[in-house]
């Protein structure tokens, strides 16, 4: 599995919020997708058909000026056309900028504060609610976005995000 999500390295290239490059790997959607696409191509070249190559992929970064559905759908279509992936694992959020977008539910602020040195914990008490917005949990919270990917792609898709009961495993 290649990690193209949560604003880790390859995902950061695709995010307009984080990628401020002015060379061939920045700028428009195509430029920002270039480096991850090249990496996937080299991986496929190295392993051939002997290993399934899948990618965890952000449908949305969950941050202002980040990667959102329109661009992520376009990139996913390019990834499928490239033919270097056997499946796409759909997710969203930014470990760097908005971790709760993926986890959903009530923010465990007391636990965050308790795990930090005293001064950092004090800062979290004051600024934590601004840093960690709350997103209500609901079953299969990424399913509405994933359905748009299903309509646009023919490759196998795997869905993350609140898959807690068997019914959602069937429809996703």
What are the roles of these predicted feature ranges?
Residues 1-172:
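Flavin-dependent oxidoreductase catalytic cores
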């Amino acid at each position: 599995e290649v990690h193209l999500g949560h604003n880790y390295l390859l995902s950061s290239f695709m995010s307009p919020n984080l990628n401020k490059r002015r060379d061939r790997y920045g700028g428009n959607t195509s430029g920002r997708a270039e480096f991850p696409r090249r990496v996937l191509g080299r991986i496929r070249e190295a392993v051939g058909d002997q290993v399934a190559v899948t990618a965890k992929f952000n449908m949305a970064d969950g941050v202002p000026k980040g990667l959102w559905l329109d661009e992520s759908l376009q990139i996913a279509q390019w990834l499928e056309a490239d033919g270097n992936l056997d499946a796409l694992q759909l997710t969203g959020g930014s470990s760097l900028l908005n971790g709760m977008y993926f986890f959903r539910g009530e923010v465990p602020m007391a636990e965050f504060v308790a795990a930090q040195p005293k001064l950092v914990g004090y800062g979290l008490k004051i600024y934590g609610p601004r840093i960690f917005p709350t997103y209500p949990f609901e079953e299969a919270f990424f399913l509405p976005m994933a359905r748009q990917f299903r309509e646009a792609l023919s490759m196998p898709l795997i869905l993350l995000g609140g898959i807690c009961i068997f019914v959602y495993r069937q429809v996703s």
